């Protein structure tokens, strides 16, 4: 797997869990889709051309790959829920994909919590206190059913005015 560490870890986590379901056949797990929506679109078209009707579900590990696959599915008329599709990261196009039903879900994180935890742990570490080697800051599955939830809306569209010093 080539790409960013976060995408690689997301892919590994996905594959580790899917391995617990032997009835699910993985058709492709080693296709790097590139760092942009355009390269992801091209790679996604190749996957769709190669596997066509064999595809029942798709997971993409980051915003650009999710965007590219969404465009590719739309271009062949299969973005109607025919292929179950879950991607990672928010962003306007992914949120619109959930609203339209073209994406069954997106997994999002809490960037404020991630940043706050990182700084807090670094301060503790520099003060000589022991800290956990690994900290899970959580992830949330966003679907058409919970998209309008207030907490999810804050994760998708952070109220920056609450965090930015207005001096």
Give the label of every model feature segment.
Residues 1, 29, 100-112:
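Short beta-strand elements at the ligand-binding edges of bilobed clamshell
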Residues 1-9, 60-63:
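Extracytoplasmic "Venus flytrap"
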Residues 1-6, 21, 30-34:
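Short beta-strand->loop
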Residues 2, 6, 17-18, 113-167:
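Hinge/cleft segment of the Venus flytrap/periplasmic-binding protein
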Residues 8-16, 37-43, 91-94, 109-127:
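Hydrophobic alpha-helical segments within soluble ligand-binding/sensing domains
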Residues 14, 28, 33-97:
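Hydrophobic alpha-helical
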Residues 91-104, 153:
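Flexible loop/hinge segments that line or gate small-molecule binding clefts
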């Amino acid at each position: 797997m080539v790409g960013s560490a976060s995408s690689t870890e997301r892919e590994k986590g996905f594959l580790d869990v899917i391995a617990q379901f032997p009835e699910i056949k993985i058709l492709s797990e080693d296709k790097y889709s590139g760092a942009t929506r355009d390269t992801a679109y091209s790679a996604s078209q190749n996957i769709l051309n190669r596997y066509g009707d064999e595809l029942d579900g798709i997971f993409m590990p980051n915003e650009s790959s999710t965007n590219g696959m969404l465009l590719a599915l739309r271009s062949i008329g299969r973005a109607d829920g025919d292929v179950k599709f879950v991607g990672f990261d928010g962003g306007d196009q992914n949120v619109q994909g959930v609203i339209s039903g073209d994406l069954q879900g997106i997994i999002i994180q809490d960037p404020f919590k991630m940043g706050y935890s990182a700084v807090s742990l670094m301060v503790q570490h520099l003060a000589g206190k022991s800290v956990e080697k690994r900290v899970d800051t959580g992830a949330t599955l966003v679907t058409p059913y919970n998209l309008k939830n207030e907490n999810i809306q804050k994760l998708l569209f952070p109220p920056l005015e609450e965090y930015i010093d207005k001096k």
